[in-house]
Amino acid sequence: MPNTNNPYRCIGKGFCGSVWAAEDGTNHAIKREDGGPGRSVTNDYNMHLQIIRSANQHRPSMPLAIPQCQSLIYSNNMWWIENLHRFPAGFTECRALISERIPKIPRSISDKIVDLFCSDTSLSAFVKGNEDDDCCLIRPYLGRRRGREANTSRFQRFSLRNVPLHINQMEDLGLDYVAYAQTMADALAMMHWGAKVDANDVEFVLAPPRASSSSSFPSHYLGKHVMWILDFDCVRHMSMDEAGLKQACAAFMRNDPFYPRPDGTESADGALWWLFRHRFLQTSAEILGDGSPHAGLPRRLMELIEEEGCRRRKKKEEIQERDEDTEQD
């Protein structure tokens, strides 16, 4: 039996709220609604359930996982009488979402990540021994390359709780980023056409699979892992029309650079975009089915994203040209 006196500790913070868990053998996490205004764990809960239902109906073929959504707790729920004392002094009751905890990256692997990206031995030792950096999850950024000139001081500004792993770093480590792109394409198609939501601000992380999982990405560097989707508090319903597509396009471009982008800086980025695009259209067609009145929407969405990517690339080139002209003057 879990120890109900075992204290919760904060394992993450976001604009919606803080995330807590106890090292007592349970596998749940508590997301408190104590963040910025306008964010709602109630919406998180409802969208989470809707996406789980869609995933159950359209089973992904890739190693994709969604945390189980267990319960929504209100501030007057009896749960707080039994558990409030497990939070630090001064914390009060609030709405909270209880869901399955994503397994953390083992220390042996997160230590290798520190060695790879941190050349400062004193800082490296601190991060390896820091309890706050114990809950390591990896954010796969297929839409961004990290500059080779990145230095140690930049490392000091991010936590092992959410390590950004950029596409060129995946290439260097021999990770199967093509499979990651296919998995994201499947997930996006499932959310848009199965759950009918815009997928706004959802996050993808690489982490170990559930003990019961039969599918995973093999990797000598990261060990067996899967791709998890989380954070649904900003997700909204989308209509199956042009307005809904524009909403989905804006969400795609606004999100952190998890997905491949059509405006990448290298030829390999363009190839990965086309692979992602092809997989998204293929999976979308399977979900919508033959004869669907919405059959043309997935391709139109890709067109909107490509148009926006082209606009952003041109704007970036214009800024670079102005900067070069200024330097010459």
Functional labels for PLM-detected ranges:
Residues T26-N27, D34-P37, P103-K104, P209, ...:
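Conserved beta-strand elements of beta-rich interaction domains across eukaryotes
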Residues N43-Q50, Q57-S61, A65, C69, ...:
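N-terminal targeting/trafficking signals and adjacent low-complexity tails
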Residues M1-R9:
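Conserved N-terminal boundary motif of the eukaryotic protein kinase catalytic domain
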Residues S40-N43, D176-T183:
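Short amphipathic alpha-helical segments
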Residues S61-V178, S213-H220, K224-L245:
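Conserved structural core of kinase catalytic domains
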Residues Y180-H192:
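Short, hydrophobic/amphipathic alpha-helical packing segments
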Residues G174, W193-H278, T283, E327:
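Catalytic activation segment of kinase domains across protein kinase-like and atypical kinase folds
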Residues R9-N77, E82-F87, L97:
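ATP-binding glycine-rich loop module of kinase domains
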